[in-house]
Structures are given as C-alpha cells and as structure tokens.
C-alpha cells in the first residue's frame, strides 16, 4: 500500500532519535523526545494560490526538520510516517 498526498501535503518517514545516550544510558520510550527529522517519501501536486498552481519546494529523498507536534501520524506496514503540510517543514538538511 502507498500513500499519495494531496495538494500541499507531504509524507515523511520519521527518523527515530537515538535510544542510547553518549554516556551509554538506554532511554525508555517515555524519556525520548518526539522526533523532528524525517525523509520525504511522497509529495502532493502543489496548491493553487490566486488561481496559479504553486509546486512544492521539497522533493522525494529530501531529509527535513519539521515542527515537533505537526502533522498526522500514520503507521503503514510497520513503518511510522507523518502526513504534513509543506508549511510544517522548517528546513531541508543538505
């Protein structure tokens, strides 16, 4: 099954934070911070602004940083994804 986002939406595969600290301490699930990085796996077709179609800036394969509590969490085939609006993406990691 695939996710095909609509409009200005983007599907991001969440990159989980490290489970072990630099000092070797293993973090329980409740102590880990909510992830804010991911890889773009699908993008929508863009949105219309003042009657003109505006393409999205992000593309498949981009590694991005997004707002901490943005988007809708989706679990598909055992993988975690976020369905975000492009405006929820703060930066592309180059």
UniProtKB/Swiss-Prot annotation:
Gene3D superfamilies: GroES chaperonin. GO terms for biological process: chaperone cofactor-dependent protein refolding. SUPFAM superfamilies: GroES-like. InterPro entries: Chaperonin_GroES (IPR020818), Chaperonin_GroES_sf (IPR037124), Chaprnonin_Cpn10_CS (IPR018369), GroES-like_sf (IPR011032). Belongs to the GroES chaperonin family. NCBIfam families: PRK00364.1-2, PRK00364.2-2, PRK00364.2-4, PRK00364.2-5. This is Co-chaperonin GroES. The gene is groES.
């Amino acid at each position: 099954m695939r996710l095909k986002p609509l409009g200005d939406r983007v599907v991001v595969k969440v990159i989980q934070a490290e489970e072990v600290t630099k000092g070797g301490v293993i973090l329980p699930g409740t102590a880990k911070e909510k992830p804010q990085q991911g890889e773009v796996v699908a993008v929508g077709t863009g949105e219309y602004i003042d009657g003109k179609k505006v393409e999205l800036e992000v593309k498949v394969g981009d590694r991005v940083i997004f707002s901490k509590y943005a988007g809708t969490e989706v679990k598909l085939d055992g993988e975690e994804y976020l369905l975000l609006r492009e405006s929820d993406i703060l930066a592309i990691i180059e």
